[in-house]
């Protein structure tokens, strides 16, 4: 039996808080075909602050809470229907982003903030691809290009701003939590 330490408790607490932060950011919504939310902002910030396992566990917990029906997704929705619906690919894409970031972190132990931000932008592109493909397969309308135009192009400038904001507040937050 594993001995629980302060670090285990801290990890669990941080993962729970990060999952809650994603949920709260998902509730801040502007309705559209694919709703505009602050989820990606929370994901960006979590991936900057807590690389690897903590970030991946946080996103997984968020998705599991939503899958069992808690209203943690955009529009205060929950349930497996949201995950399997037209926007489910973007939600799963957040997990893919975290897994990619963890993998990159294992390969490149010391990444500068600039490298981290470039990695996040590339990981977001993978999320866009995953979500657009899912949306296209779900709706069956148009082609992948049409799905990309509907699901990604309107979000590029806003998501770029979210990434800049997450980067801007990274250092002050990192400084405050570095002692825990």
Language-model-detected regions and their locations in the chain:
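Hydrophobic transmembrane alpha-helices
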Residues: 1-56
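Short helix-perturbing small/polar motifs within transmembrane alpha-helices
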Residues: 2, 10, 17, 24, ...
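Interfacial aromatic-anchored transmembrane helix boundaries in multi-pass membrane proteins
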Residues: 26-35, 63-97
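Helix-loop junctions at the membrane-solvent interface of multi-pass transporters
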Residues: 28, 49, 75-76, 104-108, ...
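Membrane-embedded alpha-helical hairpins and interfacial helices in multi-pass inner-membrane proteins
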Residues: 76, 109-180
């Amino acid at each position: 039996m594993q001995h629980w330490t302060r670090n285990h408790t801290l990890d669990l607490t941080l993962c729970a808080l990060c999952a809650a932060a994603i949920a709260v950011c998902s509730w801040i919504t502007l309705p559209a075909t694919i709703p505009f939310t602050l989820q990606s902002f929370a994901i960006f910030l979590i991936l900057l602050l807590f690389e690897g396992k903590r970030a991946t566990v946080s996103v997984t917990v968020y998705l599991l809470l939503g899958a069992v029906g808690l209203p943690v997704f955009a529009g205060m929705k929950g349930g497996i229907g949201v995950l399997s619906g037209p926007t489910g690919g973007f939600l799963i894409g957040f997990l893919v982003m975290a897994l990619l970031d963890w993998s990159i972190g294992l390969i490149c132990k010391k990444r500068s903030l600039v490298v981290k931000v470039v990695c996040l932008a590339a990981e977001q592109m993978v999320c866009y691809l995953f979500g657009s493909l899912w949306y296209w397969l779900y709706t069956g309308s148009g082609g992948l290009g049409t799905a990309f135009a509907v699901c990604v192009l309107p979000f590029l400038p806003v998501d770029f701003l979210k990434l800049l904001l997450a980067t801007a507040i990274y250092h002050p937050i990192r400084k405050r939590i570095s002692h825990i």
